[in-house]
Every structure is written in C-alpha cells, then in structure tokens.
C-alpha cells in the first residue's frame, strides 16, 4: 500500500503544532522548581540551568520523537519490547505518578501555595488547604466527568495572559534586580557538581514522563496535518518541538536567574511556590498577586483535568474492572488525599519515585530513538533495561524520606550502593550499568545478525 503523500506545513501550522507541544510541557505547576533551584544554586545558577535544561527541556522533546519514531499509541506500547509485564507495570507507575500520587495533587497545592496560603494566618493553613482541595478536585471531577472542553477553550485565552504576566515579572526583575547574580550566595550542596544537581532537579518537572504518556495526542495531530505521512511526522515533531522547547528553555533559565537574584532580598524558601508569590507581590503588589493567583489556579485546574482524564482512560483500558468514570472518582479522591499532605511532603515523596522512573524513561527514550538501527530487536531492550533497573531500585530506596530514612535497612542499602555502584555519590548510579547493558546487547544483536537469527 502506498503511503499518502504528505503536505508541506505552513509557518502558521508549525506555530500551531509548536504551541500544542508548549502547552503539553509547560505548566504553572512547574514554575516552582527553577525558582527554587535558582535560590539553591546562587551565583552558580548558569551551570544549574544547563543541567536542568537537559532533563526539563531536551529530554521531553526526545520523548515526543520516541513516540513519533516508534509509531506508538502510548507509554504501554513504547515499553512493550521489554515485555508485557514490564510495559503494564511501567505504564501503571507513570500514570499513578502523573495522576493521583504526585502531579495532580501537586497542581492543587501549588495553586493553593501561590494564591491562598499567603493570605491566611498560620493556624488556618491546614484547614484552608482542606477546603481548597475539596473545591479544586470537585471542579476537576465535574469537568472531566462531563468530558467538557471548556477549560481547553479557556486555556487559549489564559495561557497568553499568564505568559504576559510572567514576561512583565522578568522585565521588572532585570530592570530592578533583587540581587546581583555574580555575588549572591551559593547553598552548601550546590558549591560543586551543580550541572548534575540541576539535571536531577529537572526530574521534578515530570515532562519526559508526560511526553511518553500524552505525546501521542500531539503526534496524532501532526499525522492529520500531513495526511498520515509517517516519514514527515518525526521531522515536523523535531522542528515544531524545537521551537516549543526553546521557548520553555528560555522561561526556565530566566526563572532560575530570578530565583538566584531573589537571595538579595528574600531568604531561601521551602519551595518555589512561596517564592513566586513573594516576588510577584514585591513587584506588582496585591493586585499582581491576585491576578497571578487566579491565572495559576485556572492553569493548574486545566492540567489536573487533563492528567486525571488520561489516567482514567488508560486505567479503564488496561484494568477494565472499573469504567472511565469509576477510575475518575478513584483518581480524584486519591489526589485530594495526597494533596492534603502538603506541597513539601508531595515533593519529598515524589523524589524517590522519580529517581526510579527517570533512568528507565531515559533509556527507553534512547532505545526508541535508535530502534530503526537495530530493527527493534527485543534483546537490546531487555538486556539494557534489566541492567538499568537494578541501580534504579537502589536509587529509589536511598532517596526515601523519613521514617524509612535512617533505618538499618536504609543505611545498609545506601552503603552498598555507594561502595559498588560508580557515580552513586552524585545520583547517577544507573549510568555505568546502562552503558554496560548497551555494550552487551549490541554484541548479542550483532551475533544474532551474523547467524541470521534476526
């Protein structure tokens, strides 16, 4: 069958695709991480920005390309060459992470931290969070239950307003800086190895996971534009994606710089949400803070509706005991419960999960990108992923917070990891085993080709 002849996209169509990719990866909930990173890195903000950009900007684009090249319809299909059990487990973990465990409740708590918490006395902040998250997830449920597109339509208006407000904050921050970028203090842990620390901080955006889980929607839209011409899909995804991630990269870099400059006026905050509220209040007063609160609330609401709807759809397909609406109820209740732990606890508990998932996602993305070279040989996937999985499990255990941190089991695992896994001291214990897995699997693949087994 002859492949349909693809159309050449106009500049306007490229911009539309780029804006879709931008919307997929850039969310108000992610603003807090580059700001906090800037405060921690201080005058080393530039090298921190490089590391953050690799995992927060470049990797998400590569995840989209992986979806396009493998012609997958979701994270399950991308992971399938490793095996059915792995694919189902990986899809489940990513959807739980993006859904009720971390990303969805984080969107609610970021919105609360930026908009409501600064207005409440300390003794009312817990009850305030309870009331806010009740309302937040009730709205999420109603919109997702009725499958309304009201928020996506609203997003077309809100996102530009939000970006304009952010642009004005940047203008004010550099015209009237809070501190000197070249002299601000560096926190103790960011004196050395700042690029790697920025790289690991980029895990918090979860954008590479989002690309694997939801990237198919963008790729499908591109296919429709080029009459299903598969050869052009990856090329257009790369071009439009590059436009989008350059924009995201600039915003993240400026936020890191603003976070670093803020040290001239503010102490290091527990999270970037508090800092964002303080900075906007400093430059734009209560009106600016109120506008920011409304925009962040609506932006986070839009994101939460999208990811919990996707969670319910994926789970109803792979776990059909409950319908879409049943899984939606479970995800909203679960997100509400997690959100009431507070933003700091959500971030601290998400870290070990991300330290486990990200190495697997990175390796899966790399293998998917180069799969045409080895004809999708499953041995390449199985061997490499097996050797990545082991250190990823160690990373998960050794990044668990209290009460597990400090136990004898925790100490024994940590000591073993540091003693036997190279680069474990900088959080990259998976790198050497992964390279070893790649080398072994390449030898096996070449041997199979020579003996005509593939």
Label each PLM-derived region with a short phrase.
Residues 11-20, 46, 84-97, 128-134, ...:
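Select transmembrane alpha-helical segments in multipass membrane proteins
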Residues 16-26, 172-179, 188-255, 291-300, ...:
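Hydrophobic, membrane-embedded alpha-helices of multi-pass small-molecule transporters
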Residues 36, 87-121, 300-317:
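Hydrophobic transmembrane alpha-helices that form the core helical bundles
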Residues 67-77, 136-158, 224-227, 336-349, ...:
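Membrane-water interface regions at transmembrane-helix termini and the short interhelical loops
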Residues 100, 104, 163-190, 208-209, ...:
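Hydrophobic alpha-helical segments and their helix-loop junctions in multi-pass secondary transporters
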Residues 145-173, 351-362, 381-391:
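Membrane-interface loop-to-helix entry segments
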Residues 246-275:
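Extracellular/periplasmic helix-exit of transmembrane alpha-helices
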Residues 378-454:
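A generic transmembrane alpha-helix motif of multi-pass inner-membrane proteins
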């Amino acid at each position: 069958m002859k492949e349909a002849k693809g159309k050449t996209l106009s500049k306007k169509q490229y911009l539309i695709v780029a804006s879709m990719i931008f919307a997929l990866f850039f969310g108000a909930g992610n603003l807090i991480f580059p700001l906090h990173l800037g405060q921690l890195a201080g005058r080393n903000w530039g090298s921190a920005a490089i590391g953050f950009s690799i995992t927060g900007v470049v990797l998400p684009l590569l995840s989209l390309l992986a979806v396009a090249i493998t012609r997958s319809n979701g994270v399950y299909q991308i992971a399938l060459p490793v095996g059915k059990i792995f694919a189902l487990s990986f899809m489940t973990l990513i959807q739980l992470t993006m859904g009720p465990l971390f990303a969805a409740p984080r969107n609610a708590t970021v919105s609360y931290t930026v908009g409501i918490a600064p207005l409440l006395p300390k003794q009312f902040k817990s009850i305030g969070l309870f009331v806010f998250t009740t309302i937040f997830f009730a709205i999420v449920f109603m919109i997702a239950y009725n499958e309304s597109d009201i928020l996506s339509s609203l997003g077309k208006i809100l996102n530009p307003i939000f970006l304009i407000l952010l642009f004005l904050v940047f203008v004010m921050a550099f015209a009237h800086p809070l501190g000197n970028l070249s002299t601000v203090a560096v926190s103790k842990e960011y004196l050395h190895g700042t690029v790697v620390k920025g790289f690991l901080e980029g895990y918090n955006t979860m954008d590479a996971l989002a690309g694997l889980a939801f990237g198919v929607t963008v790729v499908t839209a591109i296919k429709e534009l080029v009459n299903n011409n598969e050869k052009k899909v990856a090329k257009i995804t790369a071009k439009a994606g590059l436009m989008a991630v350059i924009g995201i990269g600039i915003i993240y870099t400026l936020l890191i710089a603003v976070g670093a400059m803020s040290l001239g006026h503010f102490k290091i905050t527990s999270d970037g949400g508090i800092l964002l509220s303080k900075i906007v209040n400093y430059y734009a007063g209560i009106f600016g803070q109120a506008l920011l609160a409304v925009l962040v609330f609506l932006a986070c609401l839009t994101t939460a509706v999208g990811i919990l709807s996707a969670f319910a759809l994926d789970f109803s397909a792979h776990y059909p005991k409950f319908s879409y609406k049943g899984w939606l109820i479970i995800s909203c209740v679960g997100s509400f419960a997690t959100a009431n732990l507070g933003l700091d606890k959500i971030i601290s508990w998400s870290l070990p999960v991300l330290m486990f998932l990200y190495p697997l996602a990175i390796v899966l993305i790399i293998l998917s990108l180069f799969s045409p070279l080895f004809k999708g040989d499953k041995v390449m996937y199985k061997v490499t992923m097996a050797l990545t999985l082991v250190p990823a499990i160690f990373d998960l255990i050794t990044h668990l917070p209290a009460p597990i941190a400090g136990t004898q089991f925790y100490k024994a695992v940590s000591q073993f990891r540091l003693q036997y896994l190279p680069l474990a001291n900088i959080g990259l214990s998976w790198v050497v085993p992964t390279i070893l897995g790649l080398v072994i699997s390449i030898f096996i693949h070449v041997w199979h080709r020579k003996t005509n087994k593939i």
